[in-house]
C-alpha cells in the first residue's frame, strides 16, 4: 500500500515545505517512523543512508517544535561534521515555513562564533558529540527543555569512539523525553544505550533487499592490485562520468589517488578526516559546482553527503563491511536518476564480494577489465559528441572559409579524422606510485578458515607425519614476511 505525506495529517506549514521539496510517497522507513515520532514513541530504526531517514525523524521533530520558545527543544547527534551540516540543511528546509531555527554545531568551526549563534535561541541543535559536550560543559548549551533526542548513525559514532560522549550528553537531558536512534547495525554497546536511555522503543527495520536502489547498476571487476589504477583511469575515459566519487579505504590511499589522478590529467580532490573542515568544504563546493570531476573519499568523510548529480561510484578499495558498501553506492542513483557503481575485487577478496551480495540480496554483474583501445575509443566518442553539439549550435560562419580550403586539398573523412584526433584526450601513461593496501577478507570467511585450522583441516597437523605441519608453518612465515614488507612496498602503474 502506498502511503503519501497527506496521510500523516501534518500542519499546513510542513506540507508546504514537503511539497516544495518534491516529496510525494513516503519511503518504507518514513511510513513506519513518522507516525511513531508524532505520537511521542521512542524508536530504534535500522536503515541506511539514502532511505529517507533524515525526513523520517525530521518531520515529526519539526512538527512538534514551538518556534516562539527561546529554548532548545531538540538535539540531533551525528558522527561527522559533514553529516551534521547535511542534516541541519534538511531540517531547515522542512521547518522553513514554520520558522523553526536550526543550528549545526561541530568541531573545526570557531567556538566563539558558535556561542554567538547560540545566543539567538535556536530551537534545534544538530551536532557532533565532542563539540556538543564541550558546549554543555561550558554551559553555553542547556538541555533542560529538550523533549526530543535523535542519534543518527549510532554505530558509526561507536566506531569513532564517541560512545562515552553520547552517554554524557544523554545524562544531561530530562528523563521525560522522546529518543529516536538510527543505526545500520545494533552492536552490544548501542543496545545498552537503548536499554538505559529509551522507554519501550518501537523497532523499525528496512530489510536488506530494500537497502540498494534498483536504478543503480552494480558491477565488479576482478583486477590485481597493481593494475587497479590503470583500470580506473580507463573506466573514466570510457564512461566519461559527469560527477564521480572514488572510494579509498585509508587516508593515505585517498591522498595518493587524488594526486595520481591529477598527474594523469583528471580534475580530482580528496577528502578525509585529517583535512581541516575548511579544506573539506572547499573541495565539496568545487565538486558540487563541477569544478572538479572526481571526488576521492574515505567512508567516514563521505558519510551523510547528499550531492545531486553523482553518476558513477568507483570502489577502488573494497569496503570493510557490506553495510559500508551500501552507504557508498547510495551516493548515486538519487532522486529517481540512474547511477553506476563499480567495485574492484582482487583475487583474494572474493569472499567480500559474496558477503556484499548476501547482504544486499543482489548479484553484481562482472565487468571485464577495459583495454587501452577501449579507453581511446571512449575519449573519441566524447569528442564526437562535442562536435555534434557544436554543429547543432550552428554558429560556424567564421570558420567556413578555412573549412572549404581544407576540403579543396583533402577529402572530408580525412579532415574530420584529423579534427577528432586533435580534440581527443588520449590515455595518459604518466607513471604514478600507489602504496599497496592489504586485501580485505570477509570476517565470516576468516572465521571459517580459523575453524578449519582448529579442526585439523587445511594441511595442519593431525597426528600423522610432521611434513604437512612443517609446510603450514613455512607458509605462515612467508605470509608474515609478505605482510611486513607490504607496508613498505609501493607499486608503479603505467
UniProtKB/Swiss-Prot annotation:
The motif DEAD box: which residues?
Answer: 152-155
Provide GO CC annotations from the record.
bacterial nucleoid; cytosol; plasma membrane
* Biased composition range(s): Basic and acidic residues: 473-488
For this protein, what is any one GO molecular function term? RNA helicase activity
Start and end residues of each Helicase ATP-binding domain: 34-204
Tell me which EC number(s) this protein carries.
Answer: 3.6.4.13
Start and end residues of each Helicase C-terminal domain:
215-375
Induction annotation: Induced by cold shock. Constitutively expressed at 37 and 16 degrees Celsius in rich and minimal medium and in exponential, transition and stationary phase (at protein level). Protein level not increased at 16 degrees Celsius (at protein level).
Q: Where in the cell is it found?
A: Cytoplasm, Nucleoid; Cell membrane
User: Known SUPFAM superfamilies for this protein?
Assistant: P-loop containing nucleoside triphosphate hydrolases
Location of region: Disordered: 429-494
Q: Which UniProt keywords apply?
A: ATP-binding, Cell membrane, Cytoplasm, Helicase, Hydrolase, Membrane, Nucleotide-binding, Ribosome biogenesis, RNA-binding, Stress response
Transmembrane among keywords? no
* Swiss-Prot/TrEMBL domain comment: The C-terminal half of the protein (residues 225-494) is required for interaction with most RNA degradosome partners, whereas dimerization or oligomerization only requires the extreme C-terminus (residues 413-494). Addition of the latter domain to CshB confers on it the ability to interact with Rny.
The annotated subunit structure for this chain is:
Homodimer or oligomer. May interact with RNA helicases CshB and DbpA (DeaD). Probably a component of the RNA degradosome complex composed of rny, rnjA, rnjB, pnp, pfkA and eno, and possibly also rnpA (although rnjA and rnjB's presence is unclear). Interacts with ribosomal proteins L1 and L3 (rplA and rplC) and the protein component of RNase RnpA. Interacts with the RNA polymerase core.
User: Which protein, by its recorded name, is this?
Assistant: DEAD-box ATP-dependent RNA helicase CshA
Upper lineage is:
Bacteria, Bacillati, Bacillota, Bacilli, Bacillales
Give me the gene this protein comes from: cshA
